[in-house]
Amino acid sequence: MEQAPEDQGPQREPYNEWTLELLEELKSEAVRHFPRLWLHSLGQHIYETYGDTWAGVEAIIRILQQLLFIHFRIGCQHSRIGITRQRRARNGASRS
């Protein structure tokens, strides 16, 4: 008869602690890249939509992750990640 394996890995934090820590990290990163008024408005929208629930926490985490990903991908001046815009040669020569 098979038995479920015992948990041999490291003890994991409870989901709610991990989620709140992730939210704090995302908020501190978002404040460096977006106007506080935008972030405040986003928080108000989430609160009005979800109230004070875990669904709201999960929604704001998802939105902040998406915003930061797109922001870095487009090319944040603070980041090494992103699309580098190459200047075109004036004589029409292409770099292939």
From Swiss-Prot:
InterPro entries: RetroV_VpR/X (IPR000012). One of its GO terms (cellular component) is host cell nucleus. It is found in: Virion; Host nucleus; Host extracellular space. Residues 1-42 are annotated as: Homooligomerization. Keywords: Activator, AIDS, Apoptosis, Cell cycle, Host G2/M cell cycle arrest by virus, Host nucleus, Host-virus interaction, Ion channel, Ion transport, Modulation of host cell cycle by virus, Phosphoprotein, Transcription, Transcription regulation, Transport, Viral penetration into host nucleus, Virion, Virus entry into host cell. Phosphorylated on several residues by host. These phosphorylations regulate VPR activity for the nuclear import of the HIV-1 pre-integration complex. It comes from the Viruses. Its main location: virion. The modification Phosphoserine is found at S79, S94, S96. One of its GO terms (biological process) is symbiont-mediated activation of host apoptosis. Gene3D superfamilies: 6.10.210.10, VpR/VpX protein, C-terminal domain. Pfam families: VPR. During virus replication, may deplete host UNG protein, and incude G2-M cell cycle arrest. Acts by targeting specific host proteins for degradation by the 26S proteasome, through association with the cellular CUL4A-DDB1 E3 ligase complex by direct interaction with host VPRPB/DCAF-1. Cell cycle arrest reportedly occurs within hours of infection and is not blocked by antiviral agents, suggesting that it is initiated by the VPR carried into the virion. Additionally, VPR induces apoptosis in a cell cycle dependent manner suggesting that these two effects are mechanistically linked. During virus entry, plays a role in the transport of the viral pre-integration (PIC) complex to the host nucleus. This function is crucial for viral infection of non-dividing macrophages. May act directly at the nuclear pore complex, by binding nucleoporins phenylalanine-glycine (FG)-repeat regions. HIV-1 lineages are divided in three main groups, M (for Major), O (for Outlier), and N (for New, or Non-M, Non-O). The vast majority of strains found worldwide belong to the group M. Group O seems to be endemic to and largely confined to Cameroon and neighboring countries in West Central Africa, where these viruses represent a small minority of HIV-1 strains. The group N is represented by a limited number of isolates from Cameroonian persons. The group M is further subdivided in 9 clades or subtypes (A to D, F to H, J and K). Belongs to the HIV-1 VPR protein family. Homooligomer, may form homodimer. Interacts with p6-gag region of the Pr55 Gag precursor protein through a (Leu-X-X)4 motif near the C-terminus of the P6gag protein. Interacts with host UNG. May interact with host RAD23A/HHR23A. Interacts with host VPRBP/DCAF1, leading to hijack the CUL4A-RBX1-DDB1-DCAF1/VPRBP complex, mediating ubiquitination of host proteins such as TERT and ZGPAT and arrest of the cell cycle in G2 phase. This is Protein Vpr. It comes from Human immunodeficiency virus type 1 group M subtype B (isolate RF/HAT3). The lineage of its organism: Viruses, Riboviria, Pararnavirae, Artverviricota, Revtraviricetes. The gene is vpr.
